Amino acid sequence: MTYEFLQSYWWFLVSLLGALLVFLMFVQGANTLIFCLGKTEEERRLIINSTGRKWEFTFTTLVTFGGAFFASFPLFYSTSFGGAYWLWMIILFSFVIQAVSYEFQNKIGNFLGPKTFQICLIINGIVGPLLLGGAVATFFNGSNFLIDKGNITNNLQPVISRWANASHGLDALLDPWNVVLGLAVLMLARILGMLYIKNNIEHQQIQERCTRQLPWNALLFLLFFLPFLIRLLVKDGFSTSTGSITIESMKYLHNLLEMPFLLVILLIGVVLVLFGIFKSSRSVQYRKGIWFTGIGTVLTVLVLLLIAGWNNTAYYPSNIDLQSSLTLANSCSSEFTLHTMAIVSLLIPFVLAYIVFAWRAIDRKRITQEEIEQGEAY
């Protein structure tokens, strides 16, 4: 395995984790619908207990996503997570209050009341997808940072990456296209949440409400996602093919055309997303939409992240100094580290198999009102 192959391999793994994270944010999407789909306290508890079975998957994937970046591309980790820390801290805090809300909303002695923690779940459901989408958009639109590897010999301040302003990541929200992708991810999370609830909860009224609301949320998703995708394909990108970082017209479109297998996967992903939404919005009884739209989401997001870094592309552009932009080559770990981790990564299929087994065991029976009343529940 060459060094270049290892860099591309680990970018694929990080991108796959990011794609899975977007799919698993159906938990956040469903939580934004607690009061829209649940008209009584019993119905709201059904929704919360449905997502409560899966929130650990989302949180663990988020942490693993960050850990994989730290291990394979440490300069990105120190630049983005260390420089844009306000953005990432808000995201992390929203996930922490989610965990607390699940565990404490119906505990004895909860003087704040269940509704307070339900509102916290809604906050996480909005903030998490919105800001994560905005953070991912910076892979294409850039951020405000500087890299000076010469500082490594500075005994007083051996810091090679620094943020160029005091906002430390919040400036990403000043770029309207970052916000557009954030809103697209939020609407996609809501769609996935509805599809998951249709599949997981045995309750006629809730399923009917999901079916009615799906088309409107799908329309809003397309209104945000399609303009972002079209702009992405025609905008300038950041190429490293000449040895230095240069601007290349329609770089991301060129990446798809030069790697046609990614273009095919992208088209399949988009079709699956739309098929799952269409079928689910046409019938209250149809419950398999989560799998079509979920798989389509993973494929689509995977391709978008791959074209951000593969084919001699700077995946984290600097808007302050073009040559400070991060690439797979200038931000990765050593060849020995990547090679060793690649061997360990061969265990990933076994981990995925365990996750599938655990998922099937948890969802062997759909949630019903009787189960909430008789068993242990959130």
Regions found by a protein language model. Name each.
Residues 80-88, 97-185:
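Membrane-interface helix-loop-helix junctions at boundaries between adjacent transmembrane segments
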Residues 22-35, 96-110, 144-152, 183-204, ...:
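Juxtamembrane interface elements at the cytosolic ends of transmembrane helices
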Residues 136-162, 230-244, 307-321:
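Membrane-helix interface motif
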Residues 7-15, 114-132, 208-221, 284-298:
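Alpha-helical transmembrane segments and their helix-start/interface "positive-inside/aromatic belt" motifs
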Residues 163-188, 254-271, 331-351:
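Hydrophobic alpha-helical transmembrane segments
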Residues 1-59, 63-66:
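N-terminal signal-anchor module of multipass membrane proteins
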Residues 247-250, 316-337:
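Short, membrane-exposed interhelical loops at transmembrane-helix boundaries
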